[in-house]
Amino acid sequence: MAIKALRGMKDILPPLSEKYLNFLQTASHYAHNYGFSYIETPLLEETALFKRSVGESSDIVGKEMYQFIDKGGNDIVLRPEGTAGVVRSFIEHKLDRQGGTHRFFYYGSMFRYERPQKGRFRQFHQFGVESFGEPSVYEDAAIITLAKAILDHFEIDYTLKINSLGCPVCLKPYREELIKFLEDQEHICDDCKRRRKLNPIRVLDCKNEQCQQIYENAPKLINNLCEECNQEFQTLKNLLDNEGIIYEVDENLVRGLDYYTRTAFEFVSNALGAQNAVAGGGRYDNLVEMLGGKPTPAVGFAIGIERILDLIKDKPVQREGYFIGVMLPEALNIAFDIATKLRQSNRVIMEYKPKSLKALLKGADRNNAKYALIIGEDEYNEGLVWIKDLERKEEKRVDIQNFMER
């Protein structure tokens, strides 16, 4: 019986892998332009990191982590999200003690044991950015603008939703008001019944349709913001308005992780069905301190790459580079020299087995080459190479030495 990839985990093969690399290169370029530097953290982390950051009442920690005890007796987990690991690295390398602003971007695999479905996998990929040390709401606006720039580059249709999750000052009275509301709700799902005692605000993130209808009448955090949080949210909206960024205020948007405070946002697409969030993030000013670091304001976002790839429109295949082949074995060394030189600045595919002209041209077409370079018997004897432009359908024979010296 053949061994296959695990359920919910997929190989990324051409042509999808080309689209994947193009997304990473483009997103990295935009992040660099916004002042972010690349960071890479391990796939494995201590389980305690996510229990303290994501929250023990979250679905991720409660149901979805790939958690195990290693041979050394350590309780470890395959990372389910990227932010906590970056924060851990930020603290471990004492960047929280340096002051100033530190901006990082990252990409890589994340793991969650959940039911695979469209737009949701057990191994998935994220591109994310994290900014540490800048408390200004202008940084929140810049982060949202960066995410928008990446999505706009790929001509993705989306709706931007924003909300404010307040601060500890606003949350305490709101939490009490929400608990009082939830006590009378007997038709919510079992998960929400469990959460209403452990972390009542998390119920608003429930995707159950009946629960969502009930929560339409729940008290809204945005109506309970303290003066400072309310002013900051108004400033954020003004900044987005000034940039011509269209958004909706979603009063039930709370994100799926416990560490967010104040600004929260999501980019959603109707083209994805139930799993419609393509990017999301917000501010998490308390997380660095929660994980043992010096109090540091922070804000960031993550983009789900698989969902983005589903939305990026396929473009016509562009011919690129050279296909090199020979019709006699004696010409292989010369052809190999040509390939080595061209590969310094071009994509080159070489066929090592001598074939007929017809077969070689089929190979060039199959590999979407722009040019076919072929050495037949006559070319070999005369020191020439036959070149065909497969887009323009033009062909010529040129001196090999002159071609190599170009």
Swiss-Prot record:
Record-given protein name: Histidine--tRNA ligase
InterPro entries recorded: aa-tRNA-synth_II (IPR006195), aa-tRNA-synth_II/BPL/LPL (IPR045864), Anticodon-bd (IPR004154), Anticodon-bd_dom_sf (IPR036621), His-tRNA-ligase (IPR015807), HisRS-like_core (IPR041715), HisRS/HisZ (IPR004516)
Family matches, as Gene3D superfamilies: Anticodon-binding domain, Bira Bifunctional Protein, Domain 2
CDD domains recorded: HisRS-like_core (cd00773)
GO biological process, one term: histidyl-tRNA aminoacylation
Keyword terms, alphabetized: Aminoacyl-tRNA synthetase, ATP-binding, Cytoplasm, Ligase, Nucleotide-binding, Protein biosynthesis
Annotated localization: Cytoplasm
Originating organism: Nitratiruptor sp. (strain SB155-2)
